[in-house]
Amino acid sequence: MKVAIIGAGIVGSTAAYYLSKEAQVDVIVYDHGVGQATKAAAGIISPWFSKRRNKAWYRLARLGADFYQELVVDLAKDGIKTDFYQQTGVYLLKKKEDKLDELYQLALSRREESPLIGDLAILTKEEVAQQFPDLQGFEKLLYASGGAHVEGALLTETLLKASGARVIKEEAALSVSSDGYQIAGECYDQVILATGAWLGQMLESLGYQVDVRPQKGQLRDYQLDLDTADYPVVMPEGELDIIPFQQGKISMGATHENEMGFDLTVD
């Protein structure tokens, strides 16, 4: 069976990796490499403190967090490094300390279903200083040891390399034929659309309409002369988070800009 995957972000690259394990499946990936959300995402994995009422959303986010554990194990079995995934814990900051107690109880109630949450604790500034020196702007915060973050560009690069799939770096146009699906003159038995915000444009030519819109995200990177590899992710109240990586790199963001369309201008 010949399968095309359009889009090589987190969804497309993961699909390519697992499909490549099927001996009877030939996988081709199309990705023009512009405006990929995975590369611009903060990559924080910590869904357990969400107070959204949408139970379907929470279930998806929770199972997504759990899935990384499975993915890391599968890649390790194949002898592939998983540097893209770092489980260093997460700090949550709130302006009102009573909100920390609420979130602590919420996470505690969810831990039986989601043991990945790990250790939970409300920490003082002095306790935090032992793990994240010079972090300011709070008296107490909530800590969960199971929090993690993913470096999106490295994730997709790792998965595509592990899959061995052929990657065609061009924008794909999809059409339906009597033999299946056609992309750039090639026929495919199945197609996986992993195009994110471009899904509406992709399906419009086939007569479908979907309620999908773009959201612009921007990160700012800083380079510090510190060993930040084990620093937890910091999630203050608001949109901007602090995401430490290895070798002194710290990212801040990401923005969530709903009215910018596909504008990729850095500002």
Model-derived features: where do they sit?
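Dinucleotide-binding Rossmann-like beta1-alpha1 core, especially the glycine-rich loop
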Residues: 44-127, 131
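A structural signal for short hydrophobic beta-strand segments in well-ordered beta-sheet cores
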Residues: 93, 174-176, 241-244
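Short hydrophobic core segments
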Residues: 4-6, 187-198
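A conserved short coil-to-beta-strand element within the FAD-binding core of flavoproteins
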Residues: 148, 167-182
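Active-site substrate-recognition segment that forms the wall
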Residues: 14-21, 32, 43-44, 83-84, ...
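Rossmann-fold NAD(P)-dependent oxidoreductase module
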Residues: 18, 158, 162
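Short beta-strand to alpha-helix junction loop
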Residues: 59-63, 95-100, 142-158, 263-267
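N-terminal Rossmann-like FAD-binding beta1-loop-alpha1 element of flavoenzymes
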Residues: 2-28
